[in-house]
Curated annotation (Swiss-Prot):
The keyword Lipid biosynthesis applies. Its main location: cytoplasm. NCBIfam families: accD. Keywords: ATP-binding, Cytoplasm, Fatty acid biosynthesis, Fatty acid metabolism, Lipid biosynthesis, Lipid metabolism, Nucleotide-binding, Transferase. One of its GO terms (biological process) is fatty acid biosynthetic process. Component of the acetyl coenzyme A carboxylase (ACC) complex. Biotin carboxylase (BC) catalyzes the carboxylation of biotin on its carrier protein (BCCP) and then the CO(2) group is transferred by the transcarboxylase to acetyl-CoA to form malonyl-CoA. The gene is accD. Its EC number is 2.1.3.15. This is Acetyl-coenzyme A carboxylase carboxyl transferase subunit beta. Pathway: Lipid metabolism; malonyl-CoA biosynthesis; malonyl-CoA from acetyl-CoA: step 1/1.
């Protein structure tokens, strides 16, 4: 190595270290166009032009729904992380650890309490990035806790569903969450409070046989895949070709399974109107929307601050 290499090498090394971030560009699954990630993020993860709705994380979803992007992060009960000591190709405990590192969440469901255009509401969001949004003990406990809080606060409960189904690594303990959440929804109904479901892409498996299809009002995002079994499984079983768009939000709306297909940019005002209608609350004046709550009503602190539920 001569003296020239000694001079040039550090610069070359610094150039090699300049790596392009993996998520700098996003390819639209619908149109194939490349879009700058920050533009998609600023557009609530809707691809400009094609209007394709990308998957949205739980925190980003809550920010897009609540007034001033603030809410209570509801503290959730601890559950056994790996009750069956399950192992397939990898240990289930390791899969949980990786999912937590990837998403920053403890499990697949995040619950927040705040205001939507000045109307108090409890919102639960499934994050598909956490093991496919699968329903396990922790996710079931989060939904039940959110429903209990809605009854306590006399507020509507909104569920954003996104899941591949029950979490098989937890066996019967996972399947048990289907009747548990159903019973909790019934308690909400007995309290005279609305239950609104937003079906996002994808919502499949066991969740569609329980809480995801029990809403007083069923909304869906455009193009969302919604169904119990996969299309290929159904075709192989019935030995027939399925109709165009089968199991998509628009098809389900045409056949009465979904009440409304709502663009993500219209989701917040739509939910606010539904909450006011079902709770029989008058619409606020324009200057009151996203304004601080009255002194006698406790408003939501910043999202990072958790709040513990009182004992039952």
């Amino acid at each position: 190595m001569n003296w020239l290499n000694n001079v040039v090498r550090p610069k070359i090394r610094s150039i090699l270290k300049r790596e392009t971030p993996e998520n700098l560009w996003i390819k639209c699954p619908d149109s194939g166009q490349l879009v700058f990630y920050k533009d998609v993020e600023a557009n609530q993860f809707v691809i400009p032009g094609s209007n394709y709705h990308m998957r949205m994380g739980a925190t980003a979803r809550l920010k897009s729904i609540f007034d001033n992007e603030t809410w209570f992060d509801v503290a959730l009960p601890d559950v056994a992380a790996d009750p069956l000591k399950f192992r397939d190709e990898r240990r289930y405990a390791d899969r949980i650890k990786d999912a937590r590192a990837k998403t920053g969440m403890n499990d697949a469901v995040k619950v927040g309490y705040g205001r939507i255009e000045s109307t108090p509401a409890v919102v639960a969001v499934q994050d598909f990035d956490f093991m496919g949004g699968s329903l396990g003990m922790a996710a079931g406990e989060a939904i039940v806790t959110g429903l209990q809080l809605a009854v306590e606060k006399h507020a509507p409960f909104i569920m954003f569903a996104a899941s591949g189904g029950a979490r098989m690594q937890e066996g019967i303990l996972s399947l048990m969450q289907m009747p548990r959440t159903t019973v909790a929804i019934q308690l909400l109904r007995e309290a005279g409070l609305p239950y609104i479901v937003v079906l996002t892409n994808p919502t499949t498996g066991g969740v569609t046989a329980s809480y995801a299809m029990l809403g007083d009002v069923q909304l869906a995002e455009p193009g969302a895949l919604i169904g119990f079994a996969g299309a290929r499984v159904i075709e192989q079983t019935i030995r027939e070709k399925l109709p165009e768009g089968f199991q998509r939000a628009e098809y389900l709306k045409e056949h009465g399974m979904v009440d409304m297909v709502v663009h993500r940019h219209e989701m917040r005002p739509t939910l606010a109107r539904l909450c006011r209608l079902l709770m029989k609350v008058p619409a606020p004046h324009a200057d009151e929307v996203a304004a601080p709550p009255p002194p006698d009503v406790e408003g939501p602190p910043p999202a990072a601050e958790p709040v513990a539920l009182p004992p039952a």
